[in-house]
Amino acid sequence: MRDEQATGAAITFDRVEKSFAQKGGAPVMALSDCTLTVEPGAITGIIGRSGAGKSTLLRMVNGLERPTGGRVLVGGRDVGAADGAELREIRREVGMIFQHFNLLASRTVFGNVALPLEIAGRPSSEIRTRVADLIARVGLEALADRYPAELSGGQKQRVGIARALATGPKVLLSDEATSALDPETTQTVLRLLADINRDLGLTILLITHEMGVVRDIATHMAVIDGGRIVEAGPTYDIFVRPEHPTTRSFLSGVTGVTLPAFVASRLRPAPPEGPSQEVIRITFAGRHATDPMLARLTGELGIAVNILAGAIEEIGPHPFGNLLVSVETPRGAEARAYLERHQLLTEVLGYVG
């Protein structure tokens, strides 16, 4: 049965709750009041620390876990209420890749990719054609007859991706799919997922504890903390204006911009007596990311600026940068007002004497 109001979304988490019974004790609440909409064709990353509830949330999409409250809808169909034939139909539309690959050691690359099609009862001729196409898509044509023990970690994950695509799903779930890979292989797998998303229009929902993965691939993101979704939206918007402390904590490890230790150790929440400097974070976003605003600030207002740290990178197609600076405290408000008039974001981090 479809929910007509939710059929426009690929996946809808509607006030989802999940608790687990404990022998001789009160139930443990894993998820509480989680609401999130995953748009068709988006790559949505759910980030959270270990134990935050992200894997539990992901496993509800294909019915591996059932909510104890709320609903999980895939294409408007309630996964938690589905059973038998309807649940099998939903699962055919949802592929999944795993952190540890889950390949059958006794089957070749071809055999692993073919397995879902064999289970679905597809004709042999269709299986051969489909598997050959998928193996080519993930760049493993030369390894079709190899066994998992003969493959690298990145190659195993490519097999996992091809297998997940075998039945032509509309949604692909990624459960920490790159966390067991080295950085270079991680980037290769992320590029492959981005290509699949672009070429097939596939909706991808991934979970990770690495903000770098979200930055590199996700169009949208959600932050989960203590079983609750505390922030969600377009990835670029959240990187530019993070609101929740958990989000800020994750971002501090990926933007590459932290205060030097000799400044951080002296930072105070209020100006000390005597001469002091106001420490400011400046966020450069979009078309303003490469503007020479500090030179203009000094030239037009005569405010001396000390640069403490900085970096610029890309979030999707958009440039994004952070700069940590200090100015004389009496002129801090004037400097911030000037920068904000020119569409930059500022935040006072504290003061040093």
UniProtKB/Swiss-Prot annotation:
Entry's transmembrane regions: none
Every ABC transporter domain range: 11-251
Molecular function as annotated in GO: ABC-type D-methionine transporter activity; ATP binding; ATP hydrolysis activity
Compartment annotation: Cell inner membrane
ATP-binding listed as a keyword: yes
Gene Ontology CC terms: plasma membrane
Reactions listed under catalytic activity: L-methionine(out) + ATP + H2O = L-methionine(in) + ADP + phosphate + H(+); D-methionine(out) + ATP + H2O = D-methionine(in) + ADP + phosphate + H(+)
Domain of life according to the entry: Bacteria
EC identifiers of the protein: 7.4.2.11
Annotated keywords: Amino-acid transport, ATP-binding, Cell inner membrane, Cell membrane, Membrane, Nucleotide-binding, Translocase, Transport
Membrane-protein topology: Peripheral membrane protein
Ligand binding (ATP): G48, R49, S50, G51, A52, G53, K54, S55
Keyword Methyltransferase: no
Role summary: Part of the ABC transporter complex MetNIQ involved in methionine import. Responsible for energy coupling to the transport system.
Family: Belongs to the ABC transporter superfamily. Methionine importer (TC 3.A.1.24) family.
Assembly, per entry: The complex is composed of two ATP-binding proteins (MetN), two transmembrane proteins (MetI) and a solute-binding protein (MetQ).
Protein name: Methionine import ATP-binding protein MetN
Organism expressing this protein natively: Cereibacter sphaeroides (strain ATCC 17023 / DSM 158 / JCM 6121 / CCUG 31486 / LMG 2827 / NBRC 12203 / NCIMB 8253 / ATH 2.4.1.) (Rhodobacter sphaeroides)
Lineage of origin: Bacteria, Pseudomonadati, Pseudomonadota, Alphaproteobacteria, Rhodobacterales
